[in-house]
């Protein structure tokens, strides 16, 4: 009983820490309070930078831009050149953290986590057809973020940010609603496209109450990009095969429904840490933990060697 309580305590602490980190990061990156009060967008120097998570450029409080929005802006421009900054930004954070960003640093991920805490009968991890639907975000990435902005251009040679304009529910929640409904001039200009975006937002909200992070699992192109880096990112999970008993506790607690003991580097893993907290043998460790453990081991071995030499 004590062991189970200990695991439950670790899981609770991990989840509270993650929630605190998500909330603090969201508040920090959307800290332009005047934007919410005056219904305007921050246009200072920080806006030329990106934050790692899905955080709409047009959110009244946003202090920086969204990498997906920035990528589309570059690709849809008539003076298109490969943006070393945007690509380098995505590669840097992908190589360092992978989908840890989705689990700990994404404001819209926080929104979905909070929605899923709402009591609702028959909660489930996945939508029907999950094993096929997880590939939809890659289709959206290629089609709506890369191809259409690049090639579906008007007479001026400029394209549209297709994902932001026609799909992104995060932009509707964080920018469309507060700016559109709060500004009388913008409110009169709202039309069918805004109604479509609100419909997608409502659908995402309803699904998020019953299913865990449906947008992250099936739609988010940023998660698709970071997921490709999961196997090589500096921060990732490793299984100690000598101590793993393949009990399945990690998959049972995993809300992304991953067989962690088999595929710890799955592109679907958001590195929330729940699996590490419940592992009965402590066989799931992050690369950082392994590096610290190896460092301690080397230090202890060195101290023993010194003691032996002194004797």
Model-derived features: positions:
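Non-ligating segments of multi-cofactor redox enzymes
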Residues: 1-260, 267-311
């Amino acid at each position: 009983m004590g062991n189970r309580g200990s695991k439950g305590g670790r899981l609770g602490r991990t989840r509270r820490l993650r929630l605190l980190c998500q909330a603090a990061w969201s508040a920090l990156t959307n800290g332009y309070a005047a934007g919410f009060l005056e219904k305007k967008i921050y246009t200072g120097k920080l806006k030329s930078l990106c934050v790692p998570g899905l955080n709409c450029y047009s959110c009244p409080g946003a202090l920086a831009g969204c990498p997906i929005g920035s990528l589309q802006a570059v690709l849809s421009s008539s003076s298109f050149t490969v943006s070393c900054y945007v690509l380098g930004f995505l590669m840097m954070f992908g190589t360092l953290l992978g989908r840890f960003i989705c689990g700990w640093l994404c404001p819209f991920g926080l929104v979905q986590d909070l929605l899923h805490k709402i009591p609702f009968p028959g909660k489930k991890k996945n939508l029907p057809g999950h094993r096929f639907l997880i590939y939809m975000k890659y289709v959206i990435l290629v089609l709506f973020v890369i191809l259409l902005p690049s090639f579906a251009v008007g007479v001026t040679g400029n394209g549209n940010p297709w994902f932001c304009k026609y799909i992104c529910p995060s932009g509707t929640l964080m920018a469309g609603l507060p700016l559109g409904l709060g500004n009388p001039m913008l409110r009169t200009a709202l039309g069918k496209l805004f109604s479509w975006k609100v419909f997608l937002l409502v659908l995402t909200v309803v699904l998020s109450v019953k299913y865990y992070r449906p947008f992250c699992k099936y739609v988010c192109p940023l998660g698709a990009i970071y997921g490709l880096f999961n196997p090589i990112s500096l921060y990732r999970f490793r299984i100690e095969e000598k101590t793993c008993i393949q009990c399945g506790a990690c998959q049972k607690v995993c809300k992304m429904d991953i067989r962690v003991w088999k595929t710890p580097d799955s592109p679907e893993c958001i590195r929330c840490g729940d699996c590490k907290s419940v592992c009965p043998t402590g066989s799931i460790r992050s690369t950082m933990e392994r590096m610290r453990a190896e460092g301690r081991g080397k230090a202890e071995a060195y101290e023993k060697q010194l003691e032996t030499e002194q004797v």
